[in-house]
Amino acid sequence: MSILKKRSKEVLIYSITESKISNIFSALIIFLGSLGLLLVAISSYLGMDLFLFSEEISNFPFIPQGATMAFYGIGGLFISFYLWWILLWNIGGGFDIFDKKNKKVCFIRWGFPGKNRRIILKIPMNEIQSIRIIAGVQERGILTRTLTYESIVYMETIEQGFITLTRIEDNLTPPEIANKAGELAFFLGVPLLY
């Protein structure tokens, strides 16, 4: 996820895109793997060698191995197409708009196509109480226990409660988190709390 910032005296806009290199890489790997499984199943069904590097693929029976590979190949292609459409439609991307002129904060996110594609949350600036940095400890690792300290920037409001402004997936360093929180608190004229 990349965050682009545009700023003027009265408007601060964070543009958020959801397509990360890891998402593209995983969609590509799933597509290639499922396509390979489907080609092996077709090769088994036809009894022909569609792959130049191995003659053994066409020798195993279609039932049950080839049919199972066809099932997994088709399922993988559906998952891969779903991931590619999510990337193309930029689902989860959007804008965070802080507008002093209209005294509103808007959070706009893109959803799936349809009636409610744009998800909009509008908050009047007089409801914003503070910007908070909340640090947490997360345990990671399967075989080894690794503790990581992560900070998240929240906007505290009267009606909505705490609204997350950064996510763990943003991979922001502690100085970047502090800079973003300080910039927002200064721009909005609210206190910054730790």
Swiss-Prot record:
The keyword Transmembrane helix applies. GO terms for biological process: photosynthesis. Its main location: plastid. GO terms for cellular component: chloroplast thylakoid membrane; photosystem I. Pfam families: Ycf4. Keywords: Chloroplast, Membrane, Photosynthesis, Plastid, Thylakoid, Transmembrane, Transmembrane helix. Signal peptide: none annotated. It comes from the Eukaryota. It is found in: Plastid, Chloroplast thylakoid membrane. Coiled coil: none annotated. The chain crosses the membrane at residues 24-44, 69-89. Disulfide bonds: none annotated. It is a multi-pass membrane protein. InterPro entries: PSI_Ycf4_assembly. Belongs to the Ycf4 family. Seems to be required for the assembly of the photosystem I complex. This is Photosystem I assembly protein Ycf4. It comes from Phaseolus vulgaris (Kidney bean). The gene is ycf4.
